[in-house]
Swiss-Prot record:
PTM notes: A proteolytic cleavage generates a new N-terminus that functions as a tethered ligand.
Protein's gene: F2RL2
Xref: Pfam families: 7tm_1
SUPFAM superfamilies (alphabetical): Family A G protein-coupled receptor-like
Name of this chain's protein: Proteinase-activated receptor 3
Quaternary context: Interacts with INSC/inscuteable and probably GPSM2.
Length: 374
């Protein structure tokens, strides 16, 4: 189990380097980034789509495809398909999604602020407190950036805050998800060691272990989020007359296979491996506690709340992430991206649910279980 945890952490730290080296080694275009984020497709005004001559009536020659012609200079003004315009102007994008973000903001900001206050002033310095503090900080940072996302959607998906803030908001938006996932996995591993291997756990330098682990989580997430901050995120759409943030990319940007590897590795190491670890940890915890004392079942129910939050908030978006980018890479279509945006909106609920997880655990802690959270 320990070897698996260390191997997963090592791969998490090394994979961003591989992705970055893939971006640097593309010889087709050394002046531009080679890892465009696959959102809705947008084409510059003076480009045209591929067209097979075999589609012409009466054509009897060989099948020839005219490749897309792109301008040599980088374009900030793009055209999008009617389906994309329909989503960007729909009630789903301009009313429902901002309404959910508003709910997360209204509940999440005070809830995480109170959680941080309790962790700093009402709770002793213990291992789990370090993890919960970092989780609350990540959620609070996410919640305070939501007003920009809310204004963006209410304004018809028109971004008015500039490129730098667009990139920063995107980094925090995605970074919170994977930071929360990794921290919830760390909390699960901590409980697994405390309950299943109590003697080993008591001999660990728990406070140092928690601080180092949280530092590695933040560093790993930061490295993985670098492409979102390096690449251009803001594009002006000619037809709807709006400026999008992250939702549209230029199809004429140079591309490489590393874009697919990057997002698959992001979902695999940022979601699947932590998910498997959480299932393993809680299965072992339930088996251990149930074997000794059925009165522990109330604690098991509280612990399973992490698994519920994990499954509802993070599973849909990461599963759709893999399918969307595989579909985009092999079929060059972006039809699943709007479903991915809905799943991301659902995932944002995690930021207002995490504080209640801490409140629940603080209420259920007593003298007989205190050693589990030290």
């Amino acid at each position: 189990m320990k070897a698996l945890i260390f191997a997963a952490a090592g791969l998490l730290l090394l994979l961003p380097t591989f992705c970055q080296s893939g971006m640097e080694n593309d010889t087709n275009n050394l002046a531009k980034p080679t890892l465009p984020i696959k959102t809705f497709r947008g084409a510059p005004p003076n480009s045209f789509e591929e067209f097979p001559f075999s589609a012409l009536e009466g054509w009897t020659g060989a099948t020839i495809t005219v490749k897309i012609k792109c301008p040599e200079e980088s374009a900030s003004h793009l055209h999008v398909k009617n389906a994309t315009m329909g989503y960007l102007t729909s009630s789903l994008s301009t009313k429902l999604i901002p309404a959910i973000y508003l709910l997360v903001f209204v509940v999440g900001v005070p809830a995480n602020a109170v959680t941080l206050w309790m962790l700093f002033f009402r709770t002793r310095s213990i291992c789990t407190t370090v993890f919960y503090t970092n989780l609350a900080i990540a959620d609070f940072l996410f919640c305070v950036t939501l007003p920009f996302k809310i204004a963006y959607h209410l304004n018809g998906n028109n971004w008015v805050f500039g490129e730098v803030l667009c990139r920063a908001t995107t980094v925090i938006f995605y970074g919170n998800m994977y930071c929360s996932i990794l921290l919830l996995a760390c909390i699960s591993i901590n409980r697994y060691l405390a309950i299943v291997h109590p003697f080993t756990y008591r001999g660990l330098p728990k406070h140092t272990y928690a601080l180092v682990t949280c530092g590695l989580v933040w560093a790993t997430v930061f490295l993985y989020m670098l492409p979102f901050f390096i690449l251009k995120q803001e594009y002006y759409l000619v037809q709807p007359d709006i400026t999008t943030c992250h939702d549209v990319h230029n199809t004429c940007e140079s591309s490489s296979p590393f874009q697919l590897y990057y997002f698959i590795s992001l979902a695999f190491f940022g979601f699947l491996i932590p998910f498997v670890l959480i299932i393993y940890c809680y299965a072992a915890i339930i088996r251990t506690l149930n074997a000794y004392d059925h009165r522990w079942l109330w604690y098991v129910k509280a612990s399973l709340l992490i698994l519920v939050i994990f499954t509802i908030c993070f599973a849909p978006s990461n599963i759709i992430l893999i399918i969307h980018h595989a579909n985009y890479y092999y079929n060059n279509t972006d039809g699943l991206y709007f479903i991915y945006l809905i799943a991301l909106c659902l995932g944002s609920l995690n930021s207002c649910l995490d504080p209640f997880l801490y409140f629940l655990m603080s209420k259920t802690r007593n003298h007989s279980t205190a050693y589990l959270t030290k």
